[in-house]
Amino acid sequence: MVISLNKSMNIEQKAINTLRFLSVDQVNKANSGHPGAPMGAAPIAYTLFKKIMNHNPKNPNFQNRDRFILSIGHASALLYSVLCLTGYDFSIEDLKKFRQLGSKTPGHPERDIDLGIEVTTGPLGQGFANGVGMAISEKMLSSKYDKIINHNIYGIVGDGDLQEGIASEAASLAGTLGLGKIIYIYDSNGISIDGSNELAFTENVSQRFKAYGWEVFEDIDGLDIKLLEKTILNAKNNLDQPSLIIANTTIGYGSPNKAGSESAHGEPLGLEETELAKQNLDWGYSEFEIPEDVKKHMLECIESGMIEEEKWIELCDEYKNSNPKEYDELNKILNKKLIPGWDKEILEKASEINDPEATRASSGASINLLTDYIPNLIGGSADLTGSTNTEIKNSGNFSKNIPTGRNIKFGVREHGMGGVMNGISAHGNFRVFGGTFLVFADYMRASIRLSALSKLNTIFIFTHDSIGLGEDGPTHQPISQLMSLRTIPNLNVFRPADKKETLMSWVS
């Protein structure tokens, strides 16, 4: 039902307000959630999905799609709204079930590629790190198959993300590796749950990220979609540095009594304040109503996405004819094909094993045996390659200038390593492992838990798993870690006793 309308409101502003109020309506109906960030960041989401990203709502698994990460997972109502409007498999009824058990619209996004949700986010900073892993995957592929693999990693990050240590670890690594396909828009609204950022977060974010080696675009008006689009396109031109776009926004934008305050963050606006916000933004539509012209405008993403995918398929066919060997290699990676007969050969080798040795040495040997059969196996360690035996021999180190290396030097960044590895797994093309000492599993527990929750196939290697590590003292002696890991649902924990069990753990 239309109450009153501002005739001067263009279709883009109308679509943005639709995103705002669909988000507000979801939170109001659930009587819980976070309306503030969606109201402030709606222009960013609109710009990305409607004007920038290469994506096909009717085939969310399109291999060369741009990836989008909502690192501020509490703003999930905005993600569901934009996916619904652009033609993904979300209905208004799904939006009305926001935060309900068993719905498509849980309180924080849960990975489901068929719905357009690339990663599970909620614990702040995790999505930020996941995007770095996705960019590593993209760079590995595009460095060799650039004619058909070429996509960006976009994300909306927030003040809370940037306060988390994992984001610092991942940002530092991304700058070091020159991951130019990362473009993050920082929803800089200056508010956290406790209040103004002046209470706990006064650092100069721009200088910090420049020090990491990022290109930074400062003081961008988060309401100006033309400026946002222009800035993102400028960022795309820099393939040597990840980009951070600092978009100044207002939490709870449009709400007369809550905009710009922490009260807009984590509780419903309520029906009375929602009506005031509608009046303030001259929005005359009823609850969960989508204007017909907005529906038509946003669903244009379907046609444009299908056209882009068709172009890509034609490109793949041309590439297959002109580069059959490279195409076959890439096809095996994209489809995760193993070399035929690999399991039989592995079992034969396992039957020949008799000599006793440390299981970390056995693990290293297993890795190098399996790499011959699994062309998409990559990995590294948190600055403990020699100790954890995690080097793929004769394969080089992945770096800014050598992006074909299969060994990733994560640095002393255990938590970041976990989040980045999850991003590599979520990208969908590589099997990734990462190693450190068992006692340091505590540093990366949140990433391990999210990997299990997301049903990713990330492989975590933990060595030095005994109190027999006496000389290093109690700081390095794992006591509770093994039991702690075994309590995580969906996490398969193997603790092999010998060489054969180690190899078969890897096979499993």
Predicted regions located by residue number:
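Short intrinsically disordered, low-complexity coil segments enriched in acidic
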Residues: M1-V2, E287
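Glycine-rich ThDP/TPP pyrophosphate-binding loop and its adjacent helix/strand module
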Residues: P57-K58, R65, I113, I117-E300, ...
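Thiamine diphosphate
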Residues: V2-I153, K296-W506
